[in-house]
């Protein structure tokens, strides 16, 4: 297998690539929305200048004990989590 460097992505068909998201995010403000130690594997690809997220590839184990702000859906929370972490503009298809 060819060695990957830090700035390269594995070659995938149709501009399809994977992003591994650690559960703790280095103690970002959004860390508590995912179970600590979990990994969300997202299938992400470019669609019309935005990043489209295929939700079934996410590990959506959100805490239901007040970590997610009142009135904010898990989809919105996940979108903000990824936007803040990666700087992507997201379109979520859940």
UniProtKB/Swiss-Prot annotation:
<keyword id="KW-0244">Early protein</keyword>
<keyword id="KW-0547">Nucleotide-binding</keyword>
<comment type="function">
    <text>Binds to single-stranded DNA (ssDNA).</text>
</comment>
<protein>
    <recommendedName>
        <fullName>Protein P19</fullName>
    </recommendedName>
</protein>
<keyword id="KW-0238">DNA-binding</keyword>
<dbReference type="GO" id="GO:0000166">
    <property type="term" value="F:nucleotide binding"/>
</dbReference>
<dbReference type="GO" id="GO:0003677">
    <property type="term" value="F:DNA binding"/>
</dbReference>
């Amino acid at each position: 297998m060819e060695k990957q460097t830090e700035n390269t992505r594995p070659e995938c068909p149709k501009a399809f690539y994977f992003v591994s998201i650690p559960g703790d995010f280095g103690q970002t403000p959004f860390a508590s929305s995912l179970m600590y130690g979990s990994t969300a594997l997202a299938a992400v690809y470019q669609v019309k200048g935005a990043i489209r997220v295929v939700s079934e590839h996410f590990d959506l184990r959100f805490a239901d004990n007040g970590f997610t702000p009142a009135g904010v859906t898990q989809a919105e929370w996940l979108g903000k989590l990824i936007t803040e972490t990666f700087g992507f503009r997201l379109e979520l298809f859940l």
